[in-house]
């Protein structure tokens, strides 16, 4: 037998949760490891955002604005993006999603006139800007609001 083989006898070691504050004989009585008095010795934690009594940041800053729950989330797509389609193709919400130009049209799509269009297309979406309609029709295409 070596010194490295020594193990505590069965049942001599306590396992499980250590019970704090159970008398001074336990070695962890009286203040139970909390020190003396003060905020950190008390039960419960201060609420989120509490800054020791000074005016908290969320009350120092002014209230401002609101989020309109009736607003429509319309995705804008420029005519230059429509050049990914074949010449003479029909452009719809589904085809825009398939080709990867939009991911999730919530309240519709509006075609804007930024960039150049080089192909004749039949576009059927929620809305158009005037310049987008001009560019689509200039190449013999069709712009239809659905």
Swiss-Prot record:
PROSITE patterns: RIBOSOMAL_L15 (PS00475). One of its GO terms (molecular function) is rRNA binding. Residues 1-54 are annotated as: Disordered. Keywords: Ribonucleoprotein, Ribosomal protein, RNA-binding, rRNA-binding. GO terms for cellular component: cytosolic large ribosomal subunit. InterPro entries: Ribosomal_uL15, Ribosomal_uL15/eL18, Ribosomal_uL15/eL18_sf, Ribosomal_uL15_bac-type, Ribosomal_uL15_CS. One of its GO terms (biological process) is translation. HAMAP family: Ribosomal_uL15. Belongs to the universal ribosomal protein uL15 family. NCBIfam families: rplO_bact. This is Large ribosomal subunit protein uL15.
